[in-house]
Amino acid sequence: MDFELFILGSSSATPSKGRYQSAQLLKIHNDYFMIDCGEAAQYQLSRYKLNHTKISHIFISHLHGDHFFGLVGLLSTMNLYGRKNPIHVFGPPGLDEIIQIQLKYSETLLQFPLHYTTLENEGSEHILDHPLVDVYTIPLEHRIRCNGFLFKEKPKSYKLNKSKLPEDLSLLEIAQLKQGIDVYDENGNVKALVREICMPALKSRSYAYCSDTKVNEQYFPYIKGVDLLYHESTFLDELADRAAKTYHTTAKQAAQVAKEAEAGKLIIGHFSSRYYDTEPFLLEASSIFKHTYLGTEGSSFYVSDRISHEDNS
């Protein structure tokens, strides 16, 4: 099953040449999940031939404009293209009011259901139980309320070795084996053991999106062992003091977070427009965390191929 991340925008507060404001698209099988929606989001979707009609859920981290100013424009375009399927938006208090005011005064009547979930909990919470994935918030520390998001693939079924499968098992008992549960008869006698019949289930994959934040160890437990981690890195370490004052992170700090969290791979982004060249970010971070990648426009990453923690040392 596909589990692929597309980077649509990598700039911070203001866009710069070739770089746009925060927006990502996570493809899980045939479902599209959008994470933040900066001004150029719908343009970037079109540019990279990512079909906006497949987007079913949109997650907004916080109410700084570079993370949501493209949302109403995208919803309006979906409407113009005749969308009928519902869309689910998750975001902080106030975003639903902003959306409704913009739609009201532009006299836009959506022809599809828009469901809004307000994220008010200051701790981590389970916000979406989807057939393919569970989504949790990651409480971050920014100048205003801000959440990251953790996407965890649903546990995978065990695979059966059919040559070892007893012939007298019912479909219900076979389903039980696939869930990793041994099968016994009504007298408690063993009919089938998982360890003898099943091959180990593949590990479920995970992706964590850490938007604007200063480093705070309180969110580390929520990203522990994640396969793919996106962490903002607005500044290089030479501006660590400014990063702290503005509640942002440096490339060096992002790498230290990934190392502490024992992540598989790290993507860095949200680069300040003061930097034309992003290569120094990669050099700074990869000196601490080997498997670091620049999350620049048009890049994509598969959430798979787990890298061991030791290999990142």
Curated annotation (Swiss-Prot):
Chain positions recorded as Zn(2+) 1 binding sites? 62, 64, 142, 212
Where is Zn(2+) 2 bound in this sequence?
A: 66-67, 212, 270
Which molecular function terms from Gene Ontology are attached? 3'-tRNA processing endoribonuclease activity; zinc ion binding
Identify the EC number(s): 3.1.26.11
InterPro entries recorded: Metallo-B-lactamas, RibonucZ/Hydroxyglut_hydro, RNase_Z/BN
Complexes and interactors? Homodimer.
**Which family does the UniProt entry place this protein in?**
Belongs to the RNase Z family.
Q: What is this protein called?
A: Ribonuclease Z
Encoding gene, per UniProt annotation: rnz
